[in-house]
From Swiss-Prot:
It is an enzyme of class 4 (lyase). The gene is Hccs. Residues 88-99 have a biased composition (Pro residues). InterPro entries: Holocyt_c/c1_synthase. Its EC number is 4.4.1.17. This is Holocytochrome c-type synthase. It catalyses: holo-[cytochrome c] = apo-[cytochrome c] + heme b. Belongs to the cytochrome c-type heme lyase family. Keywords: Heme, Iron, Lipoprotein, Lyase, Membrane, Metal-binding, Mitochondrion, Mitochondrion inner membrane, Myristate, Repeat. It is a lipid-anchor. One of its GO terms (molecular function) is metal ion binding.
Amino acid sequence: MGASASSPATAVNASNASDGQPASPPSGCPMHKGQRKGCPVTAATSDLTSESKAHTVPAHQDRAYDYVECPVTGARAKDKESLDPSNLMPPPNQTPSPDQPFTLSTSREESSIPRADSEKKWVYPSEQMFWNAMLRKGWKWKDDDISQKDMYNIIRIHNQNNEQAWKEILKWEALHAHECPCGPSLVRFGGKAREYSPRARIRSWMGYELPFDRHDWIINRCGTEVRYVIDYYDGGEVNKEYQFTILDVRPAFDSFSAVWDRMKVAWWRWTS
């Protein structure tokens, strides 16, 4: 495989996807009340946000905080509060699939990743949501194919990998701390597993393996959207922190600013 370049620092272990918008936090829970204060662009962008509702919230983030446990009390939103008021049924993506061999948790974990145009953060999928997503992609469960414990581990790996991806992005964004002191937020993301980046193809021509996945993350840098490309490479066994992949994270060549960032970091690496 070979070493991969990641942020202005070094390549870091991590992997795949995230989730997004919430409803209200569990009653009495002190979390999610902090706001990103001191950002000079908050007031400046509020008009634009109200005018265009620029960043549409994904459906899987709707009422997401109904399923997030309070880190202080361990309390979760009451079951009744987690039901669709129109039919008193849980949201479809939290409903067990027909012939599902075992029950799966519907609890969701709040990420550390700020959501654009919101004081809230992205919320990761539950075990049940992940299972249903795999079914929608054509996967079918077979005897002893995946266990209840496996699904728990899959979610832990998924969440940890996204946290590491965001840390890598923050290292790049540190180059722009002067223009965006409040830090970036995540607008949207998407998987492009078979759309190999030019960098990944060049590595392949040199004899290294292709990444097993690719994501593009669009972040909001205080009013400016910036695209990051993330290539995921197999890093061996899963460690105790649920990391097993090596990430190659970098801003896409979409602007002169991104090209300049890449050139600066390449020079630093070459001369360090």
